[in-house]
A protein has these predicted regions:
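A transmembrane-helix-recognition feature enriched in membrane-embedded lipid enzymes
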Residues: 111-135
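A structural signal for short, hydrophobic/glycine-enriched beta-strand patches
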Residues: 1-115
Length: 135
């Protein structure tokens, strides 16, 4: 979230969409009070999506948001570990031009189990699309 906020330029033409947020998330409390984001910047430039529960749904939720806003390209910000699968799904589902921007999640060493889990999810995602769309 902080990296996305930092990408909003001073002209405030860039928008930050945070998808897959829990229904209890209060943007004013978290973004303004806890993270000390500028209230004016939050109000003009940050929107929150509460509908998605996984990466697949994040891509769809972002697609609908972008269509509504007439946006055709996005900067996809997520962790380095999660980026390959997120980028794949966003490219397959969103219909947007996707530029990846991976951020380090402050872990010096990522546990092997976590890397394996993410790799398996990526392989399964690709298998689903190959089977479903015969790509």
């Amino acid at each position: 979230i902080i990296e996305g906020y930092n990408q909003i330029d001073s002209s405030k033409e860039n928008k930050l969409f945070i998808s897959g947020v829990d229904n209890t998330f209060n943007s004013e409390v978290v973004l303004i009070n806890m993270l000390n984001f500028d209230q004016e910047k939050v109000e003009c430039c940050i929107e929150v999506g509460y509908l998605s529960k996984n990466t697949y749904e994040n891509a769809l939720e972002t697609r609908y948001w972008a269509l509504e806003k007439k946006i055709n390209s996005i900067l996809l910000i997520t962790s380095t570990l999660h980026m390959p699968r997120a980028e794949f799904l966003f490219n397959q589902l969103s219909g947007l031009r996707v530029t990846p921007h991976a951020v380090n999640n402050n872990q010096q060493v990522i546990p092997f189990e976590k890397m394996l889990e993410e790799y398996i999810k990526l392989v399964i995602s690709k298998m689903v699309f190959i089977k479903k769309y015969e790509i």
